[in-house]
Amino acid sequence: MFSLPTLTSDITVEVNSSATKTPFVRRPVEPVGKFFLQHAQRTLRNHTWSEFERIEAEKNVKTVDESNVDPDELLFDTELADEDLLTHDARDWKTADLYAAMGLSKLRFRATESQIIKAHRKQVVKYHPDKQSAAGGSLDQDGFFKIIQKAFETLTDSNKRAQYDSCDFVADVPPPKKGTDYDFYEAWGPVFEAEARFSKKTPIPSLGNKDSSKKEVEQFYAFWHRFDSWRTFEFLDEDVPDDSSNRDHKRYIERKNKAARDKKKTADNARLVKLVERAVSEDPRIKMFKEEEKKEKERRKWEREAGARAEAEAKAKAEAEAKAKAESEAKANASAKADKKKAKEAAKAAKKKNKRAIRNSAKEADYFGDADKATTIDEQVGLIVDSLNDEELVSTADKIKANAAGAKEVLKESAKTIVDSGKLPSSLLSYFV
């Protein structure tokens, strides 16, 4: 029990015993926080402090271990990619998938030497015959362990690995099926990436995309048309017997292997040529470039022939103009008099037509809503027509033709001009003035 110390004599406390005390209030209180949770766990599981601390320490160690996982481990196969490897005849190890046996079926030719060593260590720990026997495994799996060892020997030797990679057809990516709809770049990109692993030359140009320039596309296909491949097929050779007593047979096997390799190499080169030719034929950029070249060729031809066309057109035009000029001059004098007469008659007819148009405008406009004044309107329109000169007559007629609904305003404007000029008094044009 905790008790407060007694007050010293120099401290006085005044207590108002008559003051009002606030009533008691019941409030819910709940335990929270990580320390309460730890207490609850210990209570529910009947753990002592030492047991609880040991369990927490193990959790912390596990968390640290998981955070320190080798990133290469994430690239290795978690399970055997091909279960048939477990029963594969070790004597026929060359036909086995060595990358799958090593747990590297996803990496294959991309696997580094360090990754191969790590993967081998992991497979040895898992498939060592002693461990398999202790776990009650089959003795047949000893053969698989021998395949693992052969795979390690092959993949850690640069020459042997190159020979195996040459025959690792699992890593090949087939081209898209003909006659199907597909995205050219998504389908062909992995194909060329897989083929590029055999290139002697670097860097290797990228397939690019729809925005690649003509130069980039041409460089890409030029590279593949002149592709220099190191791919060989020694790995598929028939084993040469180590028999010094029968050298003829040994040389026969060697010649047979060389002929088989040459045949496979020729077939592979032909396959690659056909593959590149098909890619060229289906590349949308090549089609676009050909269309552009065709248009450019036609344009250059048109420009090249432009001079000849212009010269021919100029010559024909000059001849036509000379002929027309001669005919015009020959007829000019003869027709001058007739033309003058026709012009006079035409002007007279036009004037008559304009007068008629002005006179009829009032009638066509239903006398502007004043049909009872039709006679007066007709008379005053006639006075306007007779008072206008030829130029004013044409202008007035054109305005009425352009805006028949505004004929009255046009006539008012003409009447005002006549009155202002003193040609007629306003009393004679009272309707419009």
Curated annotation (Swiss-Prot):
Residues 98-170 form the J domain. Keywords: Chaperone, Cytoplasm, DNA-binding, Phosphoprotein. It is found in: Cytoplasm. The modification Phosphoserine is found at residue 50. It comes from the Eukaryota. One of its GO terms (biological process) is regulation of translational fidelity. CDD domains: DnaJ (cd06257), zuotin_NTD (cd23953). Residues 292-330 have a biased composition (Basic and acidic residues). Residues 292-357 are annotated as: Disordered. InterPro entries: DnaJ_domain, DnaJ_domain_CS, J_dom_sf, RAC_head, RAC_head_sf, ZUO1-like_ZHD, Zuotin/DnaJC2. SMART domains: DnaJ. GO terms for cellular component: cytoplasm; cytosol; mitochondrion; nucleolus; protein folding chaperone complex; ribosome. SUPFAM superfamilies: Chaperone J-domain. PROSITE patterns: DNAJ_1, DNAJ_2. Component of the ribosome-associated complex (RAC), a heterodimeric chaperone complex involved in regulation of accurate translation termination and in folding or maintaining nascent polypeptides in a folding-competent state. RAC stimulates the ATPase activity of the ribosome-associated pool of Hsp70-type chaperones SSB1/SSB2 that bind to the nascent polypeptide chain. ZUO1 can act as a J-protein for SSB1/SSB2 only when associated with SSZ1. Present with 86400 molecules/cell in log phase SD medium. RAC is a heterodimer of the Hsp70/DnaK-type chaperone SSZ1 and the Hsp40/DnaJ-type chaperone ZUO1. RAC associates with ribosomes via ZUO1. This is Zuotin. It comes from Saccharomyces cerevisiae (strain ATCC 204508 / S288c) (Baker's yeast).
